Each structure stands twice: as C-alpha cells, then as structure tokens.
Amino acid sequence: YDIGTDLRHELTHGYLHSVQPRIPLWLDEGLAEYFEVARTESGHHADHLAHLAALHRAGQLNLELERLEQVSDPAKFEQTDYAASWLWVSWLLSRPDMTTALAEFFAALPSDASTAPRLSAKLNNLGSDHQRLIREYLEQRIAKAPSLTR
C-alpha cells in the first residue's frame, strides 16, 4: 500500500471533477491512473503494462476506445479497462497532435446532462488509424520493459 499513489490518484479525480464534472469514465480513470505514479516515472505504470502485455501475448487484448467509451458504470470498470484507459491517456499525451486533440475534446465536453462527444469519433475525423497506432505504442512500451520481453 502506498499512500502517495492513492493521494495522487484521488487528487487527480478531484481536480478533474472540479473542472469538468461530466468527464467520461475512461478518461477520468485513465488520467488518474497516469498521474498516480511518481513524477519520476513519467506516467509509466508497470502493473498496467504487465497486465496488457500478458493479454497481448494471449491474444485476448481489446484496446478499442469505442468499447471503453460505452462503459459509464464504475462498478463495471474492470482491471483491463483501467489498464487500457491508462494506455490511451499515455499514448495521447505522448504525441503533440493527440495532446491537442485531447485538449479540444476536453474543452468540448458539456457541463450539463447533454450527450458528450466521443473521442473515438474525433480521432476518426482526424483520419488517424488510432487502433493500429495504440497497438504499436503498446508493443513499443513492452519492448522497452526488460522484465516483459523475457
């Protein structure tokens, strides 16, 4: 148990909800998971990476953003969803073009009960093959983690 990790995670939620109470669950959890790790780790979440690597090796990996966007009940958000959300946020923040798209998406979120836009639609409109790119990003992250390539 690490109180620092929990504090960083919960403070991220608190900050996000003070700015945007209608943030989609996947983005809320993805950002909290990304920022819960110590600053020296630069968003690298070894546990999530190991979990995703195991699913990837077993051929059971589903990184579809569209699937994550459909989950709105926190009780139905599973370990794989947290890990995939972290990966999406990590990838989005690693690329200036995607960071801009994420910021624009965040700014467009409604503050009322109206239907929120979907980031997957925005990425599709940008013409990016985000499913291929996120998978390649994961494979690169796995290759850089010596404990996962043995």
Task: Show which residues each predicted segment covers.
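Short alpha-helical functional segments enriched in proximate histidine and acidic residues
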Residues: 14-18
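Short alpha-helix carrying the canonical HExxH Zn2+-binding catalytic motif
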Residues: 2-12
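Acidic/His/Gly-enriched intrinsically disordered linker/tail segments
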Residues: 1-2, 19-150
